[in-house]
C-alpha cells in the first residue's frame, strides 16, 4: 500500500480531524491500555555506532519522529529530538510523548529518521512536505543518515519494553547503525536495574545512570477530569536530564489552552450589559429635571445605549466562537476578540527525580492585558485615567464633581439596595408564613433574618454621600435654583487628600439651597427602623402571650422601647397573621420610599460621571473593561489550576481562607513606544483584580465552568467542584466564605527597545510599578505571618528565609540597575514559596515569554532538583528548540521561529537568547 505523507504544520500536536478519529474502521484496531488523563505512550531514544557519510566526520545528529496512521496509511511528522553534537553514539535528552487524546493504537507505526545536521543556523524542524525516503535538500543544512520503523504494539510487548532497531539507508539495504527505543513510565521503578550509558558531551565523558525511585502522587488523579473540563489541546514533551550525582531525572513539559479564554469574557460582557441596562433605566427614571440637566441626561442615554449595543454585538460574535479556546497573537488587534486574552496557556513542568518527591511547577502564560484595538497613541489606562480625573476635577459650572471614591460608593450603595430590598421582602413574607402556622420557633428565626437584613439596609444609607446627592438632585429639579457655580466644601465623606496636590483636592462640589429640608430624609430613613421595631415588639408580645420563651431572638431594640409592646392590644392566638400583616406592609412601604429617593439621588451622582466629556468617559470604561476581561480570564484559569493541584494540602487550604492568595505577574514589556501604553494598561488591569473574590460551591451537574456575579466595582467568581472534591474542603470554604487574591506586578524590560529607554528615554514607569507592588507584596507577607497559625509559621520559617528574599528584592528594585532580571527571579521565588499563582507576560506571550519560562524551568531543575551543572545550557536549548514553547510559536504564527533577529538578541540578557537556528524573520 502506498503511504502518503501529510504536512506537519502543527508538528503532530494538533490531533487528527474528528471524522478520522471516529471512523467506523477504528474499531478493528487495538487501543493502548492507559491511565486516564495520562499520556498514552512515552519513549526515549539513543543511537549507537552511526556511520558517517564522510570518513572521520563528527556527527551532529537528531531524530525526526513520524507517525503512520493505520486508517489512511498516511505519514505525519510528529516531533524531533534535540541535536547532539560530535558523537556517533548520541543519547537524546528529548523524548517522545503522545497525549491521552492522540489517536494512536498498537497497530500504529512509528518511523524514526536520523539526520546529520551540518549547519544549525539553518536547521529547524521542517513544516514543508517532502517525498518519503528522499534526502533533505542540502540548503536546509542537514543530510539523511538512516531510518527505522516499528509498530507501537511491538514496543509495548517487547522484553523490558525496549527495542533495538537497525538504521537503514533509503533503499533499505545498508545498515548505518542502531537506534534504541525505550518506553518511559513517569514515576515507576525500573526493576532496580541501572542502564549505564556513556556520552561524549563537549569532550567530557559522563556516565549516566537511568534509575528512579518510586514517586508519590503529584496531584490527585481523581481531580484530572475536572481540570480537563477547563484545559484543552495539551502539547506534551518529555526530557531526561542528569543530576549532579549522575542519575537520571525525568521531566514532562505540558502546555494547554483553556476554554476560559472565551468563557470568562462572555460571562463578563453579559454582566456589563445587564449592569448598564439597569443603570440606563435608572437614569431614565430620575424624574423631571431642569432643561440643562434633562439635555445632559438625553445625551448620556444616547451614548450609553450605543455602548450597550456595541457590547451586545461583541457578545454575539464571541458566542459564534463555540469551539475556540485560544486567541493567537496575530489576532490581538481584532475588535471582536478584544475582550479575549492573548495566547493564554498553562505551562506545566512535572519533575520526577531520584531522591526527591515528584513536583509540579505551573506558570500561566498570557499576553499582557491591553487594549490593542484602541491603540496606545495617547498612552494606556494609568495615564488616561489620571488625565481624565484631573480634567474632570477642574470642570466648569455645568457639572457637579464627585471624587472617584464617592462615585464608587454610589455604585456600591445602589448595588446593596438592589440586593437587599428583595431579600427583605422575602424574609418578611416568610415571617408572615410562620405567623400563619403559629410556630414560635419559626417566627423567631424568621424575625432574626428579617432584622439582620433590615439593619444592613438601614446602615447602607448612613453615608453622608446620600444626603449630599439628595441635595444635588433637588437643585436639578425644575424650579431648583443653582445660585452660583459649585464650590468645594469640606464634608465628612471626603477621602484623604494627601495623595493629591494641595490645589487639586478631590473634594466634591455640592450646591447649597436654602429651601431644601434636610430633615425630611432623616424622617423617611428613620421610619424603616421604627417599622422594624414595631414588628419586633409585636412578635415579642405574641410569643409572650403564647407562653413562648422570653425574648424575640432578634433585635434588642424592642427592649429599649417598651411602650411599643405595651401599646399593642391583646388578640386571640389565631390572629397572629392579621396582627403582623399591616406592620409588614408598613415596613415595605417605608422601605419603598427610601429606595425610591436613594436610587434617584445616587443615580444622579452617576450621571455626573457620565455627563462629563462624552464619549471619552465611555471609551475609558470600554478600555478598562477590555483590559480587565483579559486579566480576569487568566486569573480564573490560574486559580482553578492552583486549587486543583493543592486540593489536599491542608496548609494551602488554611492559607486560602485565612489570608488569601498572592498572584504574581512577571512583565517583560519595555518602557518605550507602544509598550509603555501596554504596561500602563496592564498595571491598571492587574490592580483591578483586587475587586475579585472567589467562592467555591458544589457542582450540581457535569457543568463545572465558573460563574461570575457582581458589578464593575466588585465581582465574585463561583468555582464549581465535583462533590467528591468539595467534601475535602475546610468547613469555612464549604460554607461560602469569600476567598481573596492579592495581585502584584513586577516588570523588567529585556529587549532592544528597553535599551533605548534606559539610555535615551524614561524608565520611571517601571520603577514606580515595581516599588508600589513591592509594598503590596510586603503587606501580604505581613498579613500572612500574622494570620497563619504559629505551628505553621514555625515550620514555614524553617523551610524558607522569606524575609531575606524580600530584602534582596527591595535592594534590587532600588538599585536602578539596567535590565535587572534578578527582580523577576526573586519575585517568582517568593511567589512559589508563598503558594502563589505565577504569571509571565510579554506583548503576546510568545517570544520573550518563552525565553523566560524555559529559563525558569531550568533554574528550578538546577536549584531544586540537582540538575548537573554541565547540562544547564543543554537543557535550556532542548526546551527552547524542541519543547512546548516552540510549539506555541507555531500555533500563533504558523512558523517555527522565535521572532528575534541577531541585532535584537545582542541587547538581550545572556540567558534570554534562544539557540542558534530557532530564531529569524517571522511575521508576528
Curated annotation (Swiss-Prot):
Catalyzes the hydrolysis of the 4-position phosphate of phosphatidylinositol 3,4-bisphosphate, inositol 1,3,4-trisphosphate and inositol 3,4-bisphosphate. Plays a role in the late stages of macropinocytosis by dephosphorylating phosphatidylinositol 3,4-bisphosphate in membrane ruffles. Antagonizes the PI3K-AKT/PKB signaling pathway by dephosphorylating phosphoinositides and thereby modulating cell cycle progression and cell survival. This is Type II inositol 3,4-bisphosphate 4-phosphatase. Residues 23-165 form the C2 domain. It comes from the Eukaryota. Belongs to the inositol 3,4-bisphosphate 4-phosphatase family. It catalyses: a 1,2-diacyl-sn-glycero-3-phospho-(1D-myo-inositol-3,4-bisphosphate) + H2O = a 1,2-diacyl-sn-glycero-3-phospho-(1D-myo-inositol-3-phosphate) + phosphate; 1D-myo-inositol 1,3,4-trisphosphate + H2O = 1D-myo-inositol 1,3-bisphosphate + phosphate; 1D-myo-inositol 3,4-bisphosphate + H2O = 1D-myo-inositol 3-phosphate + phosphate. Keywords: Hydrolase, Lipid metabolism. GO terms for molecular function: inositol-1,3,4-trisphosphate 4-phosphatase activity; inositol-3,4-bisphosphate 4-phosphatase activity; phosphatidylinositol-3,4-bisphosphate 4-phosphatase activity.
